[in-house]
Amino acid sequence: MSFVIAVPETIAAAATDLADLGSTIAGANAAAAANTTSLLAAGADEISAAIAALFGAHGRAYQAASAEAAAFHGRFVQALTTGGGAYAAAEAAAVTPLLNSINAPVLAATGRPLIGNGANGAPGTGANGGDAGWLIGNGGAGGSGAKGANGGAGGPGGAAGLFGNGGAGGAGGTATANNGIGGAGGAGGSAMLFGAGGAGGAGGAATSLVGGIGGTGGTGGNAGMLAGAAGAGGAGGFSFSTAGGAGGAGGAGGLFTTGGVGGAGGQGHTGGAGGAGGAGGLFGAGGMGGAGGFGDHGTLGTGGAGGDGGGGGLFGAGGDGGAGGSGLTTGGAAGNGGNAGTLSLGAAGGAGGTGGAGGTVFGGGKGGAGGAGGNAGMLFGSGGGGGTGGFGFAAGGQGGVGGSAGMLSGSGGSGGAGGSGGPAGTAAGGAGGAGGAPGLIGNGGNGGNGGESGGTGGVGGAGGNAVLIGNGGEGGIGALAGKSGFGGFGGLLLGADGYNAPESTSPWHNLQQDILSFINEPTEALTGRPLIGNGDSGTPGTGDDGGAGGWLFGNGGNGGAGAAGTNGSAGGAGGAGGILFGTGGAGGAGGVGTAGAGGAGGAGGSAFLIGSGGTGGVGGAATTTGGVGGAGGNAGLLIGAAGLGGCGGGAFTAGVTTGGAGGTGGAAGLFANGGAGGAGGTGSTAGGAGGAGGAGGLYAHGGTGGPGGNGGSTGAGGTGGAGGPGGLYGAGGSGGAGGHGGMAGGGGGVGGNAGSLTLNASGGAGGSGGSSLSGKAGAGGAGGSAGLFYGSGGAGGNGGYSLNGTGGDGGTGGAGQITGLRSGFGGAGGAGGASDTGAGGNGGAGGKAGLYGNGGDGGAGGDGATSGKGGAGGNAVVIGNGGNGGNAGKAGGTAGAGGAGGLVLGRDGQHGLT
């Protein structure tokens, strides 16, 4: 017997190409007709006239033949198109009865089919999304909560089959009564073996003038055990009168994948806390904590706390803490870095987040404290760096404490720099954080430098003591009138004392230091760098670069902060770590611009073989344009974490001001994830863009993009930073959340693409859009594309909420493949943002699947006076179900169409509900 195989999509593509070719030829013929069908004779003689008539006749004959050919071409294209449609219809007619007969007994016995997607919960009901078929299928999306005195909770997304993505949680309903509470977002559904967890639903808004609290974002769904990304937590709900809702926690990773990113806190008088990052899988890193919400109302404006980073799996690194939210009076405290897994072989603890800026418009206030660095595993690995304290017009925030290393080997985390104070003579800089304790072999962490200010500078943090082999950490240098911290002692067997170490009472230790000074002297004279020892830190206010660590081992010195002035000067770069082991120094903060622009933060120093990159310096605060944050330092080639990008500087006047952009996260080594991008600074006119996440190492994931800065009541929020691309075998990083703004919310950052040769890695999720008071809210970022086999495209980010404008559109889900040889699941489209009096945002389209895999579900439209449209479900190709269409924002709206099922096996996706 002979068989004929037809692929309708290939036939349709060929028909499109032929139609384009026909249009091109027709255009060329029309252009040539005037010059070839009626030629003028070259002269008045009969021969010239005859030649002109002959060529004109040839031209007219050619045009007549071309018209016949064009007509034939059109009929051929029509036949090809009709034939492809006939093949598709015939296959659908043949497959549907077969699937129905297969599913019927399983559905009757268990309540769920063998192959097929779960049904969506209806909008406005908070109904659960249905569970997918046992074998192949995506979970249905949870229904949105109802609008009322207290908003109704969104429904949880349905669970996936063995192969499929979990459904997205439904958005919480809006609370309208005084003291009402917005509905909680529904939890995302979990995947089983291969597939991504669903994103948590956004918390509902509270729109009353008295006492309303935004709803809590939903928890992200867990990733598939063998492949797929964990779901991101939903953003907390907006509050017009009191506290924004807390962001939802990220979902847990699978065996090899990173935990989901925590949701951003909601905007309010007091910003909501960011959600905690999800726990990493067995070999995966913890997810990054969500950024704290913007505290936006006058003297009550307090930024929300950043979420803590998720703990690493048994063998994974800890997640980075989220940045504290900025506040018009007081900045929010940053989240702490997550601890690495107990048995990790060199994985580092997560870095603490940067504290939120305080007193950005009204003059008073204090910056938020930087988060503490996470601890390494039991035996090996370096501690995470402490976060930088936030800028405060009255007082800078304290830097975070560095994390402790493993007991046998690893360096202590560097303490965070104290936040800068304002230019007034009564202002105070924040104290630097203490450096962390190392293992038996490793350097003590450097103490953070004290923060600059127009009044009293901050004191420096103490350096950590070495144990057996390693240098003591540098004592942090105090700013103007602030004392420097004590340096740590060198190791008992070998190691130099850190800067400003106290006098030892041990004769052996003093003799050891004299011998090291003698050994280092010729090397320093020849190269400007010791053999064993730390680099010197730059003095605050000078912008000097930190010195490089010793050639064998040593930490790089911290860069000095830039000087304040009309335009602030740039901070110094951190010094490089030693060749064998050593941490890169932190970049210095940019100087405050008292009547102009803030100085740029210095870049963090890079490690070489074993060690973590330094954190980029925070951009200087300013009256016009905040300084750009410094880039994070690169991780060591073999072991160590990449440095975080520095946060952009904020603006502390109510005029035309723009926040500085966050710095790019550092690049990873072979096995480490890229560093997270810095948060954008706050500005009255426009918040700064978040920094892009750093590129992942050869076998590791890209870093998370930084959140966009917040804009003022008539300004725009900054765009979230793009997620870093995965290494050759790694997953893409998640995009950062967009900043909040009165007139326009910032768009969420796009997710990073997975590496080209990945076997199970997924594209990064897009960031959520920022909220807006009276304009259009930010759109969710598009999800990144998946890797080679079994990965999922990243989910699109949810659109932001708008009180009196238009809700943000949901981001498009990432594709499960780029070329026809790839397989994987399409990412789900993000949900459109809701609006109280305007139009809801449209849901994002689901991503197209690879050769084998389900299409992504379309995102639900946002609720509003005019309903947002549901996004279309993505198509499957050979084997797999089409994605479900997204629900309309409310009854009477337009729902999204379901995607087409696979040619060989798979059901069409269900249409969304209205």
Swiss-Prot record:
Keyword Repeat belongs to the record: yes
GO CC field: extracellular region
Transmembrane residue ranges: none
PE domain location: 1-93
InterPro entries in the cross-refs: PE-PGRS_N, PGRS_rpt
Domain of life assignment: Bacteria
Disordered: region residues: 412-431, 895-914
Comp. bias regions, Gly residues: 895-904
Keyword annotations from UniProtKB, A to Z: Repeat
UniProt record similarity statement: Belongs to the mycobacterial PE family. PGRS subfamily.
Name the record gives this protein: WAG22 antigen
